[in-house]
């Protein structure tokens, strides 16, 4: 099939597919889809988790066609990279040390007591430790708005990371949140480690984390203010 023929034949399918996804009650299947469109020879469908089971589920519950080509991760890729949880008066931490395995998201706090500004964006990624002790990337929707924020000295920024428990079951264990910031035009990869648990009492009774004494109120006895993101008008870092 030529590219032109593919476009002519596939466009009606994309319209039908869009309506099926919008109207489905299987929200977990819809959330597994990060994008779709007419490619060179087929309709490309991008999935967070691209296993045979997920493809079968999509074809049975949403729509099936021989022109569908699925893309995405089938086995989480190995990523044993590490970052910093503090540097020059800048600190990152999870809001709680532990979250439920069924939690839709985890929250993190970036504190700036560096004496100057830093910039940050929306992009993040997560890793988890598997049963063999290997760190792998947690499948998520990696599409983010390309926007930059300025975090002033003495301010904090609260970020949410989606965990997608409805797309893939998250197991109890250790996880890492990675978030890049820019200090004086130099990128720095920050990292905060946290846990997921299926013990309801453990995550319900978990206390909020606090800024280490070294950082708390370190400038003129002033406590940090909360800033959920002040856009600086730039389109990227």
What is the predicted role of each segment?
Residues 1-13, 27-58:
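Short glycine/threonine-rich beta-strand-turn micro-motifs
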Residues 2-23, 68-77:
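N-terminal targeting leaders
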Residues 41-43, 88, 102-104, 155-157, ...:
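Residues at beta-strand starts and edge strands
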Residues 60-76, 129-130:
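Surface-exposed edge beta-strands and adjoining flexible/disordered loops or tails in beta-rich
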Residues 78-145, 150, 180-206, 214, ...:
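Primarily secretory-pathway and cell-envelope proteins
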Residues 140-184:
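Short, solvent-exposed, Trp/other aromatic-anchored flexible loops in extracytoplasmic proteins
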């Amino acid at each position: 099939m030529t590219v032109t023929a593919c476009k002519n034949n596939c466009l009606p399918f994309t319209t039908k597919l869009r309506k099926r996804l919008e109207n489905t009650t299987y929200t977990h299947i819809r959330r597994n889809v990060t994008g779709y469109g007419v490619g060179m020879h087929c309709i490309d469908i991008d999935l967070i988790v691209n296993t045979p089971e997920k493809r079968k589920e999509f074809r049975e519950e949403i729509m099936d066609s021989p022109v569908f080509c699925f893309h995405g991760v089938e086995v989480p890729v190995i990523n044993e990279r590490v970052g910093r949880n503090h540097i020059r008066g800048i600190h990152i931490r999870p809001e709680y040390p532990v979250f439920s395995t069924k939690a839709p998201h985890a929250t993190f706090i970036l504190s700036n007591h560096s004496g100057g500004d830093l910039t940050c964006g929306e992009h993040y990624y997560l890793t988890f430790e598997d049963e063999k002790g290997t760190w792998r990337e947690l499948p998520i929707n990696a599409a983010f708005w390309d926007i930059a924020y300025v975090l002033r000295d003495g301010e904090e920024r609260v970020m949410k990371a989606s965990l997608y428990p409805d797309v893939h079951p998250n197991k109890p264990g250790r996880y890492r949140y990675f978030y890049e910031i820019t200090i004086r035009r130099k990128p720095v990869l920050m990292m905060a480690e946290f846990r997921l648990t299926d013990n309801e009492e453990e995550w319900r009774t978990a206390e909020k984390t606090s800024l280490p004494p070294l950082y708390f109120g370190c400038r003129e006895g002033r406590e940090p203010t909360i800033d959920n993101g002040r856009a600086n008008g730039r389109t990227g870092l």
